[in-house]
Amino acid sequence: MLKKDFWYDLPKELIAQEPADPRDAARLMVLSQKDDSIQHRIFRDLPEYLEPGDLLVVNNSKVLPARIVGVKQPTGAVCELLLLRQVKGDQWECLAKPGKRMQPGTKVSFGDGTLTAVVDETLEDGNKFVTFYYDTETLYEKLDEFGKMPLPPYITKQLDDQSQYQTVYAKELGSAAAPTAGLHFTPELMDTIRSKGVGIAEVTLHVGLGTFRPVMEDEITDHKMHSEWYSISEETAQRIRETKAAGHRVIAVGTTSCRTLEAVAAKYGEIKACSGNTSIFLYPGVQFHCIDGLITNFHLPESTLIMLVSALYGYEKTMAAYKVAVEQKYRFFSFGDAMLIV
């Protein structure tokens, strides 16, 4: 298939600039795999579509406030780093601005001067390896103090509260972007879901900025996916196996949870406790081996994420649903409304 097959026209005013308030007041488009029907609901209505014995799998990764502004030493020139991933120990891969002026050996101080770093190496893609002279725990404390959330480029409004870009169950620091399908959940909604006999299990996948990288190739199978680190605990793996064995549904909350489960199922033939890196690319024609349903947001045209949704729900039906979403003025992208496929 071609990249252009996944294009749709989206009015700019439908790109959400802030989350729904309260979170579960977002709209929910419900797509039935049984009869192809489309229903228009509110996210807090989600429990009506869940059955006792179902298992929701959420991504508990937490976004690092990883965008930090500093000054070069000794010139005092302003610069910016965005921490992308931990390479080893105190060394991180970073996006640097202005990159050309931050050559190896450049020293930078941040905040009140207690956070310092030095550029070690420039990579082929222009990113930098940077060493921070702190252990990981101390660095995270400094980022909490000085850092800003690395919001997607299509969100131009500043957050009133940085917690707006975290899920209520986020706990494992490491993402450069939020697993946004989970932003719609509130503690009260999760309690309601559990009270219905529906389980909630956690996996971890640290979302990289590659999630925003556009597909450049015309033929989608020529696209090379970015790699992201994931982890599945023994408890979660066992709950998923038991759910499947009992004939109940495993519903992924977000494309990151989906990619984690499908990567492990494809690699091992079952869900097992493990961790590693995945660059799995799910597009029409690729078979799913674990999930039975998906909760997700409305994604960018020609993105790998709309391709993933098309792989699960079907290309024609997915593009038709997006057309309806535009007509019905759903809110799109990270802070937008949600879709449930069951």
Predicted stretch roles:
Residues 1-342:
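Surface-exposed, charge/polar-rich loops and edge strands
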